[in-house]
């Protein structure tokens, strides 16, 4: 894997290219790209995303969605945020995870992430993938997002590996099948 900063520079260039923005060369596949990185580079990636968000010279409309912040917003909407620590203390982490996974699913994430209208030049960048684990699984969320974001590119900042068929979070966890992403960004 090449140097993380060099790879992020390539992302900066890529998201502004008309072929990327228009989904050219994808053979009618969805325009979902995965940028894989070592989880130890998380702070470098976060800094890069923060810089992109304030870059007035970008030739695209970057829409950054931190999935962990989205998760917290969903918890706030459900008025359960304050109860979570007590629930974990009383019933344990496994029970809390089970209850949250039952209560908060892909539908809630899609509803929170969705915006309209999508405009030409929009790029949805998903961040916070490692932070939101284990409350949501990326392969399942991407499947759920596809019908709502088929007209704009989606770029996932992924702390792990994607080999074109399997997503493996943190380069350690059991891989999950995901076949629809077009490619990973080297």
Model-derived features: where do they sit?
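Surface-exposed peri-terminal alpha-helical interaction modules
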Residues: 90-94, 123, 149, 164-165
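Glycine-rich, aromatic-bearing surface loops/beta-hairpins
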Residues: 137-186
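Short acidic, S/G/P-rich loop/turn micro-motifs used as interaction or catalytic elements
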Residues: 40-44, 70-71, 99-106, 130-134, ...
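A short, acidic, amphipathic alpha-helical segment used as a generic capping/interface helix at domain edges
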Residues: 17, 105-117, 138
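Extended, basic/helix-rich recognition subdomains
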Residues: 31-33, 37, 41-44, 48, ...
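Conserved P-loop NTPase "ATPase switch" module shared by AAA+ and STAND
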Residues: 119-135
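N-terminal, charge-rich interaction modules
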Residues: 3-81
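Long, charge-dense
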Residues: 62-110
């Amino acid at each position: 894997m090449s140097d993380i900063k060099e790879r992020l520079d390539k992302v900066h260039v890529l998201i502004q290219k008309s072929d990327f923005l228009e989904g050219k060369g994808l053979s009618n596949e969805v325009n979902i790209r995965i940028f894989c990185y070592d989880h130890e580079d998380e702070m470098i990636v976060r800094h890069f995303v923060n810089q992109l968000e304030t870059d007035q010279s970008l030739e695209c409309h970057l829409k950054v969605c931190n999935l962990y912040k989205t998760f917290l917003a969903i918890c706030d909407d459900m008025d359960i945020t304050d109860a979570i620590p007590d629930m974990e203390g009383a019933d344990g982490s496994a029970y809390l995870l089970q209850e949250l996974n039952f209560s908060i699913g892909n539908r809630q994430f899609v509803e929170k992430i969705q915006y309209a209208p999508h405009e030409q030049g929009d790029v949805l960048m998903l961040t916070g993938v490692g932070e939101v684990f284990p409350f949501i699984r990326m392969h399942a969320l991407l499947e759920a997002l596809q019908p709502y974001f088929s007209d704009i590119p989606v770029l996932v900042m992924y702390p792990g590996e994607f080999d074109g068929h399997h997503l493996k979070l943190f380069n350690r966890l059991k891989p999950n099948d995901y076949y629809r992403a077009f490619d990973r960004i080297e």
